[in-house]
A protein has these predicted regions:
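Conserved alpha/beta core of the MobA/IspD/sugar-nucleotide pyrophosphorylase nucleotidyltransferase superfamily
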Residues: 1-25
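Conserved catalytic region of serine esterases and O-acyltransferases that act on ester linkages
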Residues: 23-30, 207-213
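Hydrophobic positions in alpha-helices of CheY-like receiver
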Residues: 124-128
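Catalytic His-Asp segment of secreted/periplasmic serine-dependent ester chemistry enzymes
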Residues: 144-213
């Protein structure tokens, strides 16, 4: 009957949610293990990247004349805080500048909200300040998407607007407009899959970030 169908659909939805969360956790732990040497490294890097896969996939050794320590992991801000920052996995965390980029994974989650994402990202900013008080923190805005059913640009714009006006203790770097095509979507000159950046995309990202550092 109707009640049984509703109960089944609710259970199915909950099981899917649990499976997604378990998959994210497994992926996070695998990447953290892979990056363990980078977390432990004693380095004179002037810039540290903390964020999801768009930062993690950026193959760059120097940015604006400073050595880069890339600690990007394809997870949410919440998991980054719980699995990496709070346990203080990052040793020798002395970079003068820290660049953050989070949010694109959050908007694929059921029930997400700009306020909740902002609170999670603010918690990361506050934790970075505790561990590296002299660091200047920069937060990169989300880039647009194209050809994706799991993300839409209305959500991206809404989140960018909220984060840029509510985060504190960080310098916001807007990226959205520079990556859009004439239709307001991610220009596919800069991406092969509609979310992640390709070589040309990273060239543009380097230019935009360097101008603000």
């Amino acid at each position: 009957d109707v009640d049984d169908r509703i109960d089944f659909e609710f259970l199915h939805t909950m099981l899917q949610k649990i499976h997604r969360e378990e998959t994210q956790l497994h992926t996070a732990k695998r990447y953290i293990k892979y990056l363990r040497r980078a977390f432990d490294e004693k380095t004179d890097a002037g810039i540290t990247f903390l964020g999801h896969s768009i930062l993690g996939d950026w193959d760059i050794e120097q940015l604006a004349g400073a050595k880069v320590r890339n600690l990007g992991v394809p997870i949410t801000a919440k998991l980054y805080l719980e699995l990496i920052l709070k346990p203080r996995l990052i040793k020798h965390f002395t970079s003068e500048r820290v660049i953050l980029m989070f949010g694109t994974n959050e908007i694929t989650q059921e029930g997400w909200s700009p306020k909740a994402v902002c609170e999670e990202l603010q918690a990361i900013i506050d934790e970075v300040k505790r561990q590296n008080p002299s660091a200047h923190i920069y937060t990169l805005g989300l880039t647009p998407t194209a050809m994706r059913v799991d993300r839409n640009n209305k959500d991206v714009l809404e989140l960018n607007t909220y984060l840029s006006t509510h985060l504190h203790g960080t310098t916001w770097i807007e990226l959205y407009k520079d990556f859009t095509d004439k239709y307001g979507k991610l220009d596919l000159r800069y991406s092969n899959d509609g979310v992640h950046l390709n070589g040309e995309g990273y060239k543009l990202l380097e230019k935009l970030v360097t101008e603000r550092l």
